[in-house]
Amino acid sequence: MNLNINTLFASFPSGLAQGLLWGIMALGLYITFRMLNFADMTVDGTFTTGGAVTVMLIIAGWQPWIAVLVAFFAGLLAGLVTGILHTKLGIPAILAGILTQFALWSVNLAIMGFSANKAISVNTYSLAISSRYVPHAILTGFITAALTVAVMYWYFGTEHGSAMRATGNNPEMSKAQGIDINTMKMVGLALSNGLV
């Protein structure tokens, strides 16, 4: 591989397209680590779960955007499991995340038909974002990231979103104000893992 300045500039557009989508994952991590003060290890498993669900649905003939939406809900469920383990069963936050992460390894293999990888090609399947069509990929990534940030900004400005932010900042005071902090933690974990 020739490493020169031209190669660097040639790889910039596809890196930008991928980086925009990775930014959504960073937003999901921000919700648990910064807003809820919850060290969530579940995201290691839900990242793979989202990919496994998306790939298997695209291979089955589903549209990529519908597959991504279903993968979002799969992540929601995984985050909810972590939330239930922590809030309802009293398992410490870090351990609840690790338990869910380990469980997701088996779940991910089952989703993919007990195969460690699945081949997916832009030649065979209609993909929403591909490095082959870089201008389209950058535009799609930018629109997706902008819409996600806008919806999250709106949500965290609502009463429910403010209650979630308050839960992370000061759980004792939030509880004194009548906020169900366990529900807020579960919703935050579900939302975070869905975005990842």
Q: For each predicted feature, which ranges?
A:
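Membrane-interfacial amphipathic/re-entrant helices at transmembrane-helix boundaries
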Residues: M1-M25, V53, A60-I66
